From Swiss-Prot:
Originating gene: fluC1
GO molecular function: fluoride channel activity; metal ion binding
Name of this chain's protein: Fluoride-specific ion channel FluC 1
Biological classification of the source: Bacteria, Bacillati, Bacillota, Bacilli, Lactobacillales
Xref: Pfam families: CRCB
Inhibition and activation profile: Na(+) is not transported, but it plays an essential structural role and its presence is essential for fluoride channel function.
Length: 129
C-alpha cells in the first residue's frame, strides 16, 4: 500500500476512535467534557510528538494517525471557544474568564508533562532497541 494512502487510512481510523471517545466524555461529563478532552489531548499530542522524536522507530502512518487522527478528533478548539462564548452570553463572566484562562494554563501544563514523559519513555525504548 502506498505511503499516502496508509496515512489517510490511519487518520480516518484513529479519528473514529478519538471522536468516539470525545463524544463519550461529553455524555458522562456534560459540563466538563470539552475541558477534559482538551487537557488530555494536550498531554497526548506532546507525548506522541516527543516520544517519536526520541524513539525514532515510529512509522509515519502511526504518528500521523495518532496525532492528526486521534488527538485531532478528540480535542476541539471550536467547542472550547463556543463554551466560553455561551458563558459570556449567559452573563457568567467570571466563570467564562476562569474557564478560558484555566483551559490555557492547565493545557500548557499538561503539554509540558506530556513532553517530559514522551521524551523519557522514547529514550528508554531507544536504549533497549
Amino acid at each position: 500500500m502506498n505511503r499516502r494512502l496508509k496515512n489517510y487510512l490511519s487518520v480516518g481510523i484513529f479519528a473514529f476512535f478519538g471522536g468516539g471517545l470525545r463524544a463519550y466524555l461529553n455524555l458522562i461529563w456534560s459540563q466538563t467534557g470539552t475541558l477534559t478532552a482538551n487537557i488530555i489531548g494536550c498531554f497526548l499530542l506532546a507525548f506522541f510528538t516527543y516520544f517519536f522524536v526520541e524513539y525514532r522507530e515510529g512509522r509515519d502512518w502511526l504518528v500521523t494517525g495518532l496525532s492528526t487522527g486521534f488527538v485531532g478528533s478528540f480535542t476541539t478548539f471550536s467547542s472550547f471557544n463556543l463554551d466560553t462564548l455561551k458563558q459570556l452570553e449567559s452573563g457568567m463572566n467570571s466563570q467564562a474568564t476562569i474557564y478560558f484562562f484555566s483551559s490555557i494554563f492547565i493545557g500548557f501544563l499538561f503539554a509540558y508533562l506530556g513532553m517530559l514523559v514522551g521524551k523519557r519513555t522514547g529514550r528508554k525504548l531507544a536504549e533497549k532497541a
